[in-house]
């Protein structure tokens, strides 16, 4: 993307940069790496693929349900259709929901390398969208972040996808030290989960991913007991976890908005969803493949 001048002070909204690929055929990605141009001021970069309008919309195999946050000790209630949309919660992280995540960068995150037979697709004519979160520190800067991609030499057997299980419907009261926020995904096809990536801000304490099988059996597949906002990473399973059709992936997170949290920007404030680091997010990213589905050809 073009260079961006970062002011010395102030709050900077997420910046979006569009980079046409000019690809005349579909490309498959075996690996990718984002390099921040100004690591003093770049908090994270998310590179997504915005493809031309497909002739046949891709079926959605993941259904996300946020669970309404509850007071400590109370039972969580499912969100309703009348609940406020994410934009009303103060953030725009969902505003590009039609784009497919390609590769991310934040401090602590490794560049993904997919095994042979797997890959992410960039359809011909697509545009790469760089979402960049800048922070200020009293000194100006200039950033021109970039992405490097390794193309597959052959069409993979399966397409790798990135999903996110998120809940923007919360308000963390001042002084609460163990506030719970939950969300879940339900799968309409057999899927294999390959990796997970918890995302919260400074009040985030821990996050747990639990697989719930169609027969009701539960299995904790990832627990991050001490979330570190300054070191975010992907957690890859030793082998992919098969979740049969009808399974759920349940994500539960806890937040500390008390004075005991040394990183708390302001324990006197009620905290809601928002892009900035003094606000909060609850996102459980995960990487998956759909079983029994071959990677789409260029003609699709």
Question: Across the structure, where does each feature detected by a protein language model lie?
Answer:
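Beta-strand-centric surfaces of beta-sandwich/beta-rich domains
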Residues: 1-192, 198-300
